[in-house]
Amino acid sequence: MFPMVTEFMNYGQQTVRAARYIGQGFMITLSHANRLPVTIQYPYEKLITSERFRGRIHFEFDKCIACEVCVRVCPIDLPVVDWKLENDIRKKRLLNYSIDFGICIFCGNCVEYCPTNCLSMTEEYELSTYDRHELNYNQIALGRLPMSIIDDYTIRTILNLPEIKT
């Protein structure tokens, strides 16, 4: 008789404990119910990137002096700088400049150490393509400024601010 009573008491304690755990889970679910959703509808909504976001590199051909500092500071020696020495004026003349974004790690060293500020980071991050050879940008492709997502009226922009707990 006594073992049956103790089993019944254990069953009651286990039932109470299970109900408490279910109640705790339900309270957590209810606490998240009044929060804004975290997900965005990507093609139609985009987050505004921070001002220090490291996206695609923008290149200004006229400012470049072909010093090759960008190649020396790049951890993977990525930028390809073709230049010709002008003997009459004893200066380098830039012929071609290209970066392969399929290999680039977007560290930003080239932008940081460029003495003439001809390189800058943009907010463009949509670089996907079906052919990897299309990711090799020459000076013409690097010179194009991307359209700002704030200016695009077809896309709803969402400001990504951290929540402040009060």
From Swiss-Prot:
Alphabetic keyword roster: 4Fe-4S, Chloroplast, Iron, Iron-sulfur, Membrane, Metal-binding, NAD, NADP, Plastid, Plastoquinone, Quinone, Repeat, Thylakoid, Translocase
Descriptive protein name: NAD(P)H-quinone oxidoreductase subunit I, chloroplastic
Biological process, per Gene Ontology: photosynthesis, light reaction
An example molecular function term from Gene Ontology annotations: quinone binding
Organism, as annotated: Raillardella argentea (Silky raillardella)
Topological type in the membrane: Peripheral membrane protein
PANTHER family assigned to the protein according to its UniProt record, in alphabetical order: NAD(P)H-QUINONE OXIDOREDUCTASE SUBUNIT I, CHLOROPLASTIC (PTHR47275:SF1)
Assembly and oligomerization: NDH is composed of at least 16 different subunits, 5 of which are encoded in the nucleus.
Coiled coil: none
Binding site for [4Fe-4S] cluster 2: 74, 104, 107, 110
Subcellular location field: Plastid, Chloroplast thylakoid membrane
Cofactor(s) this protein cannot do without: [4Fe-4S] cluster
UniProt-annotated binding residues for [4Fe-4S] cluster 1: 64, 67, 70, 114
Family of this protein: Belongs to the complex I 23 kDa subunit family.
GO cellular-component term (any): chloroplast thylakoid membrane
Comment on bound cofactor: Binds 2 [4Fe-4S] clusters per subunit.
Protein's job: NDH shuttles electrons from NAD(P)H:plastoquinone, via FMN and iron-sulfur (Fe-S) centers, to quinones in the photosynthetic chain and possibly in a chloroplast respiratory chain. The immediate electron acceptor for the enzyme in this species is believed to be plastoquinone. Couples the redox reaction to proton translocation, and thus conserves the redox energy in a proton gradient.
EC number assigned by the record: 7.1.1.-
Domain 4Fe-4S ferredoxin-type: 55-84, 95-124
Reaction catalyzed: a plastoquinone + NADH + (n+1) H(+)(in) = a plastoquinol + NAD(+) + n H(+)(out); a plastoquinone + NADPH + (n+1) H(+)(in) = a plastoquinol + NADP(+) + n H(+)(out)
Pfam families in the cross-refs: Fer4_7 (PF12838)
Chain's gene name: ndhI
